[in-house]
């Protein structure tokens, strides 16, 4: 079967936004207008097609990125839904990897919010071209021009409106198309087509001003157009459109559109913009890959050539079991064929291939380069794994996933559920690389770790819904770390003589603090003249790493240390790897005790938005939680407080904030960095840990 949609007519796009900007509604309307979902699902009634997990229906926030295919003007649009809640940043990061372009949705009232900044940074990191859609133009306080200014000031981007709104709030009727210089008017709130009219008299000056800005922004991308512009020659519609696309793909501009998805206004022009200005898979830089031996290679988007794809999401589907969402970068994936998991060195058989239309599924025989689908039947493939052909086992860029910052102990309500809980947690950990499961060696408890309270709540919730396991959850535990503050040198001799062959290892170690944020550990071999034979050096390194797993103060993992082995001695008969490993491990612990060891705690970046009258209470409360306020600003009549707060003090914050502000304040919180714990707090932590 040949491909139905040529590569240049494929668009892989994500819709990224902050919670409540109306992302799900926008996705819904896109699916509606492209003719897939006939009844429009509303998020507030809990029936949106994109939000297909039960909890999303209850919480009204989008958690898992479902990939959905729809068609507009004969183009195939693969829509990847990205979550907007900060505990799920990992999901956003994961979907950014496989997108070619994005639609950033902003609320016309709320504008650029902290989560928008996080998502924007991720899109910059992966060089994703984007267009902005200012949604909810029908709401009280809607202001398109404010959002334009915030995109400039806060996101440091270059927004270029392709439309300006006609009216706002209840009087929002449509938009002025600044390319064709016509008014597009929707005459009712029902999902209908717009009517093209002349620009209303009171908007003609503003439209002219913004049209000129648009043309100038476009002209800057091309010398020929620049000459025309300076000679006062009008650019043709085609020239303007081509210029917008060039400038969008080079990330020089962010085209801005507006509308209200809820009232069905502005969605068709948004779809046109996706087709006209966002890139096809062959218009973005080739993805890089490498081979086992480290040799780099560029993987071109084409149906010819050996198969290469990235598994970017694992989901458990109640009907077909485990689904692996893949994006094909090169070649063709056929159902029933074998693929090679290059990173793991394993062959896997592809069962069925499904194309998802929200929550309906269509079985297809093949997926071509640039396309996205879900594969049934892969056993060993995890998020971020490359699938390739055995002839050309390329590994595409790995995704990097952050370490969890919060843990809780979970126990099944009944003994009978113990095994079921183990299976459930293992499956959930396969789906989500930022979620970890471990067993506490001392207590035997099962410990789950993740990126925030909401993240873990949802995991426990899913265990109950999908796997019917009821779990008791312990108090949240913070992922503390330990490090040292001064450089020390430490000698350690491990010598045991117990009849027959003895044990002998002797090392001199230098422990130095390293700058945080880089590698956690560095080992330097500085042995001169064979004082410690070469074959024992790796054992010394290993001994230090083992000692770092449990620090000297309270047994937390040790970070940011450089260890240099600079001298030692050995015994012809009694020395062994074991002896040197033990000498290094014990020497490391003794050295760490003298090196001003301190405890580090995760600091969260907290942003609170509150009505002014509660500002004093909110700041007072943050100070009580050992927070440091960095900045205060205004947004839409409210006060914004930016602060760093220790995660340990932030449990249950949402409830406290609600009661302080009568439910009128909102906040967002994400992990930022590790910082030293004050002495009095550190003493308490040590006392608690060492009982």
Curated annotation (Swiss-Prot):
What GO terms in the biological process aspect are recorded for it?
ribosome disassembly
Q: InterPro entries attached here?
A: EFG_II (IPR041095), EFG_III (IPR009022), EFG_III/V (IPR035647), EFG_IV (IPR047872), EFG_V (IPR035649), EFG_V-like (IPR000640), EFTu-like_2 (IPR004161), G_TR_CS (IPR031157)
User: What domain of life does the native source organism fall in?
Assistant: Bacteria
Q: Which SUPFAM superfamilies match?
A: EF-G C-terminal domain-like, P-loop containing nucleoside triphosphate hydrolases, Ribosomal protein S5 domain 2-like, Translation proteins
Q: In what residue span(s) does the tr-type G domain sit?
A: 8-282
Q: Which UniProt keywords apply?
A: Cytoplasm, Elongation factor, GTP-binding, Nucleotide-binding, Protein biosynthesis
Report residues binding GTP. 17-24, 81-85, 135-138
Localisation = Cytoplasm
> Mostly located where?
cytoplasm
GO terms (molecular function) for this protein are: GTP binding; GTPase activity; translation elongation factor activity
One Pfam family linked to the record: EFG_IV
GO cellular component labels = cytoplasm
Similarity comment: family membership: Belongs to the TRAFAC class translation factor GTPase superfamily. Classic translation factor GTPase family. EF-G/EF-2 subfamily.
State what this protein does: Catalyzes the GTP-dependent ribosomal translocation step during translation elongation. During this step, the ribosome changes from the pre-translocational (PRE) to the post-translocational (POST) state as the newly formed A-site-bound peptidyl-tRNA and P-site-bound deacylated tRNA move to the P and E sites, respectively. Catalyzes the coordinated movement of the two tRNA molecules, the mRNA and conformational changes in the ribosome.
Protein known as: Elongation factor G
Its ancestry begins with: Bacteria, Pseudomonadati, Campylobacterota, Epsilonproteobacteria, Campylobacterales
């Amino acid at each position: 079967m040949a491909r139905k949609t040529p590569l240049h007519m494929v668009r892989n796009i994500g819709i990224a936004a902050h919670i409540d900007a109306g992302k799900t509604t926008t996705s819904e309307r896109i699916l509606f207008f492209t003719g897939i979902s006939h009844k429009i699902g509303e998020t507030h009634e809990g029936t949106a097609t994109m939000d297909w997990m039960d909890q999303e229906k209850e919480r009204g926030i989008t958690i898992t990125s479902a990939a959905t295919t729809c068609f507009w003007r004969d183009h195939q649009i693969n829509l990847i839904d990205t979550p907007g809640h900060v505990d799920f940043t990992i999901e956003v990061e994961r979907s950014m990897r496989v997108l070619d372009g994005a639609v950033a949705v902003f609320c016309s009232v709320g504008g650029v919010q902290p989560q928008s900044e996080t998502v924007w940074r991720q899109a910059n990191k992966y060089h994703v071209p984007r267009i902005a859609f200012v949604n909810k133009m029908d709401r009280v306080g809607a202001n398109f021009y404010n959002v334009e200014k915030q995109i400039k000031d806060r996101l440091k981007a270059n927004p270029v409106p392709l439309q300006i709104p006609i009216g706002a709030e209840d009087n929002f009727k449509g938009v002025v198309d600044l390319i064709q210089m016509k008014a597009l008017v929707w005459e009712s709130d029902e999902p209908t087509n717009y009517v093209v009219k002349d620009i209303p008299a009171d908007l003609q000056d503003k439209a002219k001003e913004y049209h000129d800005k648009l043309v100038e922004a476009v002209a800057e991308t091309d010398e020929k157009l620049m000459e025309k512009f300076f000679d006062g020659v009008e650019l043709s519609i085609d020239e303007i459109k081509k210029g917008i696309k060039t400038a969008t793909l080079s990330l020089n501009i962010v085209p801005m559109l507006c509308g209200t998805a809820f009232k069905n206004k502005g969605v068709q022009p948004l779809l046109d913009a996706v087709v006209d200005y966002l890139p096809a898979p062959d218009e973005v830089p080739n993805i890089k890959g490498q081979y086992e031996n480290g040799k780099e290679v560029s993987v071109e988007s084409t149906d010819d050539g050996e198969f290469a794809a990235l598994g970017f999401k694992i989901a458990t589907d109640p009907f077909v079991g485990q689904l692996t969402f893949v994006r094909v970068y090169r070649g063709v994936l056929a159902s029933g064929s074998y693929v090679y998991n290059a990173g793991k060195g394993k062959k896997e058989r592809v069962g069925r291939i499904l194309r998802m239309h929200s929550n309906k599924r269509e079985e297809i025989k093949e997926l071509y380069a640039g396309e996205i689908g879900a594969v049934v039947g892969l056993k060993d493939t995890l998020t971020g794994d490359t699938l390739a052909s055995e002839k050309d086992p390329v590994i595409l860029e790995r995704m990097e996933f952050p370490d969890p910052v919060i843990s809780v102990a979970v126990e099944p309500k009944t003994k009978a559920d113990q095994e079921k809980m183990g299976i459930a947690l293992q499956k959930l950990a396969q789906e989500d690389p930022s979620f970890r499961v471990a067993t506490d060696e001392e207590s035997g408890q099962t410990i789950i770790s993740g990126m925030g309270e909401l993240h873990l709540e949802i995991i426990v919730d899913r265990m109950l819904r999908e796997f019917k396991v009821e779990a008791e959850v312990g108090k949240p535990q913070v992922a503390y770390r330990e490090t040292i503050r001064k450089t020390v040198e430490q000698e350690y001799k491990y010598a045991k003589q117990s009849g027959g062959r003895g044990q002998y290892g002797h090392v001199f170690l230098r422990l130095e603090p390293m700058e945080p944020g880089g590698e956690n550990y560095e080992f330097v071999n500085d042995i001169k003249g064979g004082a410690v034979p070469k074959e024992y050096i790796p054992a010394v390194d290993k001994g230090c790493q083992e000692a770092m797993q449990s620090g000297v103060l309270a047994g937390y993992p040790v970070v940011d240390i450089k260890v240099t082995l600079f001298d030692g001695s050995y015994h012809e008969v009694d020395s062994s790897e074991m002896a040197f490993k033990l000498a290094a491990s014990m020497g490391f612990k003794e050295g760490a005790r003298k090196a001003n060891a301190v405890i580090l705690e995760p600091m969260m970046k907290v942003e609170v938005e509150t009505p002014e009258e509660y500002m004093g209470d909110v700041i007072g409360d943050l100070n009580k939680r050992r927070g440091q306020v960095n900045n205060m600003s205004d947004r839409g009549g409210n006060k914004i407080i930016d602060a760093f707060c220790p995660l340990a003090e932030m449990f249950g914050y949402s409830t406290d904030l609600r009661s302080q502000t009568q439910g009128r304040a909102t906040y967002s919180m994400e992990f930022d960095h590790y910082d030293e714990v004050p002495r009095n707090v550190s003493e308490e932590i040590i006392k608690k840990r060492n009982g």
